[in-house]
Design a protein with these regions (language model features):
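N-terminal catalytic cores of secreted or lumenal carbohydrate-active enzymes
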Residues: 2-14, 18-21, 75-78, 88-321, ...
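Histidine-centered catalytic/metal-binding microenvironments
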Residues: 1-40, 151-248, 533-646, 940
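CE4/NodB-like, metal-dependent polysaccharide N-deacetylase domain
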Residues: 328-355, 359-360, 367, 434-449
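Short beta-strands within extracellular/lumenal beta-sheet-rich domains
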Residues: 63-79
Length: 1009
């Protein structure tokens, strides 16, 4: 019982003693106030009649995202001049820091620091007689009226210092059992110290002298003699995770950066050992644009070795949805910015809060000069716990990368560590002990990394963190010894340790987050714009190179770069996943509209320049943006036609254009030379017979292309989540309004209009004269909420795994639920296609903008719409236009050509009529060609340094390839480069041809000069 009394005694003592550290406190009134909009620049407003007196009972705010200025000429009492003072600001709203009222404090005209629920003090060290105080206030995501309270405080420095020296060891005992020796020992020393403190008259000479005596006792007996540094270290680095957008817009993110970074800089002045790390080049660019002066201060702290610039990427991007080339550009743009602005070569991919990690990443990282990967989000998996926290992660091509999972969490006495961890830790005994307890690789490493500080506008580390560090760095028994160190140097040390230790484990394949599966589908329009923009800008680059090489046309470097920056920005892990507020998507949509207009202009300018210079007798000019010779459908004068043998990354003037079809269509069946489809009364497939392969595609007794609506009310994180019980309640979308036949050039089909509640689903199903695929064009006016809409194809395929398209390759995933790990993958991410094949036959389901798949028990499902209502109450209640294609085939997806068909769906042939004309260019041209079926050229662009052309290839079938790459232009030299375009070695060439050997799923980048 006495031990319990000890804990209670210390708790109430510290509460009382903390009050007695205050030497002076006075409420400050008489502020002037002026509502405003978002400020532009750092010019302070003129204090004129537009400012009104803010009286004692006044309130401010009253709406979301309200802004205001507060001003006060502060007169410091004479007895306080020369002392260290603090001006404390509060709003009486103490909720979550990310959405609370926040301020930027300007002292004597200079932006000094941010203020928020965690950082309430404006530091006035060596106080002057008077100050001009401006506070730029932001109400947060609150529509309530807010208080505004300011006090001027002074403290007894020795008492405040002693407070922390007592509080830290006291907190250590809270995470040990009362019968442990360390608990008993600390109790004796701490009680001995507090018994020396005379609190009869706080502030008296007796009080202050007793404080000095107690501090000397602790320093001598406890910290000096008893405490020994533990063998376990907690490497600590200040951090503030700032979401580029989420529950706020990009405009507010700019302010969050100003507040957070200025607060860090201000605390650095007070705590010389304080080190801080921040990622995301985009945030630094925001800072540079908003406050060049503050940006210069950050650069100086980087130079002095106190501020760590790391992270590699432009933003902390979603790694499920971003394309392979986008991930390359994330790192290329991010690392280039850090190198050019700070002289830093970033070596760490820092993604603490991203919703899963593609198995293509290890190779992308390694070939970008990034050799370490850090996250913590994987600890949020709701079913299984990753067995490792320090390991080598092996990707689809066999490349491995050193990986470290952060493990900070609260320690709970008497309980085993929880699964969830945090990247917004507190530098206190609770989380240092909890972080090491949670860490699983103690047999190879005795250190953990703690990133401490409030995120998302919470302002980063607080004074308490840094005061605790001053105590914990001494080495307090019962808690890991705190050590301030950059993340990069810590990770490099642990990596070397792991490389030497044979016990270091390896994880092969994707790091699948068993959570947030709805992010593959939510906010479908945003995902569609991302997919369109990715292909548009790659094609615009390639065509610009074509026009440059053929005609000497200037390459639009700046416009292309700006467009890519916007694409990368919108791949932030709360924008593209669909988990932000409505206003974020309104801004994002405008940004996409702008860059799509610019990208189309660049592409069209290049195509037009080429077209105007072709020497031809006339016909149809067809451009093929893909890296393989293509025959397929395209639009000509609004009609679907079929063209043959269009050269890769090139064009051809053709005269043989097919524009008719022999497809048979009724309301009961569709038939061409490839398939015979029987329809039931709802328009679903009751049979799909593959005439070429003489087999039924659908499982006996089952129906294909059945649209099903599932109740989607996840247990939390509405727009993020799909909970596994969603299948318990569903409704078939079978209310048919009409079925009518369609004919369009080389294709024919039916249009089915269905109703579901208040929504209208129009689906056009097409069969083709020359291509063995079935297209489903969808035009949906969606009005529902909390519904998950899927299409399903139950196939007659026997396979225990399915193949999914990802960045620069594919992954296989189980179709069964044998283990909890298998069952947890009830919804997975893929890019352009997924395939289910048995030996000799299979079915691919392609798409032009969808990402969520579900293939189990031979049923292929594609998720079409998810419409939660938090944080966006109107999410996906809009028009949806998209296409998916069913491709039954002989062989597997490799033999069938699924990869090429998927590229053609997303990057189709383009045709236009061309009249007879004279010109300098031939009627047929290929910028490059590859003599291998399993190698794709993803990118052709000018080099970032302007010196040459970059060509990026990858092997797409998990097979080795010896290929000849033939270019359509002259070049003197060819170099193998990394993904950052650094030359690694010179290659031999034979005329315009380069011979290459690619390993399975290997990415190869060349520079031609």
């Amino acid at each position: 019982m006495q031990t319990d009394f000890y804990e209670d005694r210390l708790r109430v003592f510290l509460e009382e003693f903390k009050k007695n550290t205050v030497a002076y406190s006075e409420k400050i009134e008489g502020f002037l106030y002026k509502p405003c909009e978002y400020k532009v620049g750092n010019e302070l407003p003129v204090v004129d009649e537009s400012f009104k007196s803010f009286e004692k009972n006044d309130r401010w705010g009253g709406k979301y995202d309200a802004h205001a200025w507060f001003y006060k000429k502060l007169i410091v009492p004479k007895e306080l001049t020369g002392k260290n003072l603090e001006l404390t600001v509060s709003t009486q709203l103490d909720g979550w820091d990310a959405v609370n009222p926040q301020f930027i404090a300007y002292v004597d005209g200079k932006l000094q620091q941010g203020l928020d629920v965690n950082h309430r003090e404006i530091f006035l060290d060596n106080a002057k007689d008077e100050y001009d105080i401006f506070l730029y206030a932001y109400s947060g995501r609150n529509d309530c009226l807010l208080d505004f309270n300011v006090t001027l405080n002074a403290y007894y420095e020795n008492a405040r210092r002693l407070y922390y020296k007592i509080a830290v060891p006291y907190e250590v005992t809270l995470y040990h059992e009362p019968y442990e020796k360390v608990y008993v020992d600390i109790e004796n020393y701490v009680v001995g110290a507090i018994n020396l403190i005379d609190m009869r008259v706080p502030g008296s000479k007796e009080f202050l002298d007793s404080v000095d005596t107690a501090e000397a006792y602790l320093d001598r007996e406890f910290y000096g003699k008893y405490c020994k540094k533990e063998d376990v270290n907690a490497v600590c680095i200040g951090h503030t995770h700032i979401d580029v957008a989420w529950l706020w817009t990009l405009a507010q993110t700019r302010e969050k950066v100003l507040r957070s970074f200025s607060t860090v800089l201000e605390l650095m002045k007070k705590y010389p050992e304080y080190k801080f790390m921040s990622s995301q080049a985009q945030l630094y660019k925001f800072l540079k644009e908003e406050s060049p002066e503050l940006y210069a201060e950050v650069k100086e702290m980087v130079r002095l070795g106190r501020w760590e610039v790391e992270g590699a990427m432009w933003v902390e991007a979603d790694c499920n949805l971003s394309s392979g080339e986008s991930l390359v550009r994330q790192i290329l743009y991010g690392k280039s910015f850090f190198k050019n602005e700070f002289g830093v070569d970033s070596k760490v991919l820092w993604l603490p809060d991203v919703f899963g990690y593609s198995a293509a990443l290890p190779q992308i990282l390694r070939k970008s000069g990034v050799d370490k990967f850090v996250t913590s989000k994987i600890g949020w998996s709701e079913t299984d716990k990753m067995p490792y926290d320090t390991f080598f992660w092996k990707g689809i091509d066999g490349t491995d990368i050193f990986t470290y999972f952060m493990t900070a969490q609260d320690k709970v006495r008497g309980k085993k560590p929880a699964t969830n961890v945090t990247y917004n830790a507190k530098l206190n005994p609770c989380q240092l002990i909890g972080g090491y307890d949670r860490y699983q690789q103690k047999d190879i490493n005795n250190e953990v990394m703690i990133t401490f500080g409030y995120g998302d506008g919470g302002g980063g580390p607080i004074r308490k963190d840094l005061e605790y560090y001053d105590v914990l760095k001494k080495g307090v028994s019962g808690v890991p010894c705190a050590k301030m160190e950059f993340a990069g140097s810590f990770l490099e040390r642990i990596k070397k340790r792991a490389e030497k230790n044979p016990k270091t484990p390896c994880w092969q394949g994707e790091l699948y987050l068993e959570y947030h599966r709805g992010t593959y589908t939510s906010m479908a329009q945003n995902k569609k714009l991302n997919r369109r923009s990715e292909f548009l800008y790659e094609n615009a680059e390639m065509l610009s190179v074509t026009a440059q090489k053929l005609l000497g046309k200037e390459y639009p470097r700046e416009a292309l770069h700006d467009g890519w920056e916007t694409i990368l920005l919108n791949q932030f892990h709360d924008i593209i996943p669909g988990s932000s507020i409505k206003e974020v998507y309104e801004v994002s949509h405008r940004q996409y509209e702008k860059i799509c207009e610019a990208g189309k202009r660049i592409k069209n300018d290049a195509e037009t320049a080429v077209a105007e210079n072709i020497n031809t007798r006339g016909g149809v000019l067809v451009f093929n943006p893909n890296s393989f010779e293509a025959s397929g459908e395209t639009k000509l004068d609004g009609k679907t036609v079929y063209v043959k043998n269009i050269p890769p990354k090139g064009y051809k003037v053709v005269t043989d254009v097919c524009n008719t079809n022999s497809v048979k269509v009724t309301d009961k069946f569709l038939e061409n030379r490839f398939f015979k489809i029987k329809l039931d009364k709802t328009g679903a497939f009751s049979s799909l017979f593959d005439k070429k392969n003489k087999r039924e595609v659908l499982k006996k007794g089952e129906r294909g292309n059945v649209l099903t609506a599932y109740e989607d009310i996840p247990r939390d994180y509405d727009n993020w989540e799909i909970s596994n019980y969603y299948t318990d309640k569903s409704w078939e979308v079978d209310s048919v309004v009409s079925i009518k036949p369609l004919s369009d050039g080389v294709r024919a089909g039916i249009e089915i209009t269905r109703r579901f509640l208040s929504s209208t689903i129009v689906q056009r199903i097409w069969l083709y004269e020359n291509t063995p695929k079935i297209d489903f064009e969808n035009d949906i006016d969606w009005k529902e909420s909390h519904i998950l809409l899927k299409t399903a194809f139950p196939t007659e395929i026997n396979a225990d795994k399915a193949t999914y398209d990802i960045q620069f390759g594919t992954v296989e995933r189980p179709t069964h639920k044998n283990t909890s790990w298998d069952a947890a993958k009830f919804e997975v991410c893929a890019h352009k296609f997924a395939d289910l094949s048995e030996y000799g036959y299979g079915v691919s389901l392609l798409n032009d903008c969808k990402y969520g798949y579900d293939i189990h028990d031979s049923v292929i499902r594609l998720t079409l719409i998810k419409c939660g209502n938090y944080p966006n109450p109107d999410a996906d209640e809009c028009r949806h236009e998209f296409t998916y294609s069913l491709f039954p085939h002989s062989g597997d997806f490799r033999e069938a050509g699924t990869v090429k068909l998927a590229y053609l769906l997303n990057s189709p042939l383009e045709a236009k009529k061309i009249e007879s004309q004279n010109g300098t260019l031939p009627e047929e041209y290929s910028l490059l060609s590859i003599d291998s079926e399993n190698v794709i050229c993803e990118t052709v662009k000018n080099a970032e340094d302007g010196d040459g052309v970059i060509v990026r290839l990858y092997e797409c079938c998990n097979s080795r390839a010896n290929v000849n790459l033939t270019l359509g232009f002259d070049f003197d030299d060819v170099y193998l480069t990394d993904l950052l375009e650094n030359e690694e070695r010179k290659l031999q060439k034979h005329g315009r041809t380069v011979n290459l050997t690619l390993k399975p799923f290997e990415i190869v980048t060349l520079k031609l000069k």
